[in-house]
Amino acid sequence: MKDDKILRIYTDGGCSGNQSEENLGGWGAILEYGSAVKELHGAEENTTNNRMEMTALLEAFRAIKKGGQNIHVFSDSSYLMNCFREKWYVKWQTNGWKTAGKKPVENRDLWEALLPFLEEHEISFFRVKGHVNLNSKLTDFEKLYEKFCEWNGRQFSYEEFEYITEKNNRADELANIGIDEIRQP
């Protein structure tokens, strides 16, 4: 099911009160290489969901001990996936970090921190559906499996899809742990 030569990263970020002035955001990441697993989490005040999604990936990248890795990233963030898979960042850099609408790119600091890792490693990005109930009716889960394969343009085994979904849910739990920890005095 898993390729022991591929470093898999599962990430999630979330924000309670997203876009409000007094919100809390959390992020979670899981790094998996063969049988070795490392879980990371953290939180910030006055942030956004997108920043937490990006922070999860950045902290996962920072935890990698050596360069030249073959990495598969699994995330439910359309923002992250679209940027990397459609190479938005290339257009942004060419346009002086402006969007197609001539506005400054949001979260530029995090994008600039993430981009060097693309040069250092061979990275593939896979979009997953977030917050999946693993006890869903079989037909609903099968539809999610078909959508997952369609989104990613390749076939995964059903068992692999279940495993990836479990890991994505765990990354979400880690993000919530981060939020809970920052709430405590």
Descriptions of predicted regions:
Residues G14-Q19, L58-N168:
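RNase H catalytic domain
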Residues E53, L57:
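Short, conserved alpha-helix that lines the donor NDP-sugar binding/gating region
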Residues M1-R51, R62-A63, F84, S136-K143, ...:
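RNase H-like nuclease fold core
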